[in-house]
Structure formats: structure tokens, C-alpha cells
């Protein structure tokens, strides 16, 4: 009878350990999948991770929090914590700032337009983007505050603000370096191909 009890205890212990291993494997699998998505699309937002992973909101939140606490990923919270973007822990902070702006559709359009034309007026940007003047002004302010563009004033008869990219080399390097992650953005791909041909 003692042998049966001992064998039962051993087998229960084995199943407990096996269950723990299975749970750890599942945890590692989910973490690996999330890290892969973040590596493939630096600057990805929570909703996109939710869609790609197929996880429920609570489960994704749990895993993202663990990855962030263990410093396997970086969470960049901007705009009073309204916008969070996720990055691999090996991406320099200067690049995360640029990527965050490029991932925003309106700001990406504005940045690429200014890159192509060296400097532009607000009206030229409005005409190109076909967005409301207030929308363009708001995004230009964000780009200026984020250190992406600077404002110059031409000294002609009619003084105008000109918007110019502040660090041409850094922005074009990021566009080129992360070209694959911007694959769905046709306009970025066209621009990087032009830059590579020069």
C-alpha cells in the first residue's frame, strides 16, 4: 500500500512539473510571437498587435506588461499617454522618435513631401495632402515640437513660413534602414527607391 501512495505522489509531482513546463512553453511562444511582430514593425501600436496576435485585450495587456517589465521591449508613450508605440529594445531612442512620426499617415505624407521639395509653405503642404488647414497646422506643430521640422521665414515681399526637415540624414537613414517595416506604405517605398538611385 505504501508503494502505491509513493508512486501516486511521484506521478502527481511529474504531472505538476510537466504542466508547469507546458505553461512556460506557451508563455515563451506568445512572448516570441509578440517580439517578432514588434521587431518586424517597429513603432507598432497596441491595436495592431491585438489584431495580429489574435489575443484578447486582457491577455495581450498581460504579456506586453511582462515584456516591458523584463526590458525585452520598449514602450514609447507620447501625447499624454494617448499613443503608445512598441519597439525592440535595441532601437536607439532617436530612431524611435522618427519612426513614430513616420507611422502617422498625415505626418509621413508631410515629411516625405518636405524631403522631396527641400522646404515648403503650409499652403503647398495643404494642397499636396488635401487635408484641412487646421489638420495640417496641427501636424506641423507636432513635427516641429518633435524636432522633425524647423520653421524658416523667407524675406521676400510677402513673408512666409517655410518648413524644412531638421535632420535630413537621420530621417533618410531611418527610412532606408526600416524600409521593410514600412512595406505597406507605397509612398515611403517610392521615396527610398529614389534615394537609393541617387
Q: Which residues does each predicted region cover?
A:
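Long, low-complexity, charged/polar intrinsically disordered regions in eukaryotic proteins
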Residues: 1-21, 46, 55-96
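Long, low-complexity, charge-rich intrinsically disordered regions
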Residues: 1-36, 66, 91, 109-116, ...
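Residues within the helices of the helix-turn-helix
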Residues: 36, 47, 122-123, 141
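Alpha-helix C-caps/helix-loop-beta hinges
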Residues: 41, 70-71, 146-147
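Short capping segments at the starts of secondary-structure elements
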Residues: 41-45, 117-121
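A short acidic, leucine-rich amphipathic alpha-helix
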Residues: 48-52, 124-129
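Canonical helix-turn-helix DNA-binding module
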Residues: 57-62, 131-141
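Donor-sugar nucleotide-binding helix/loop cap in glycosyltransferases
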Residues: 84-115
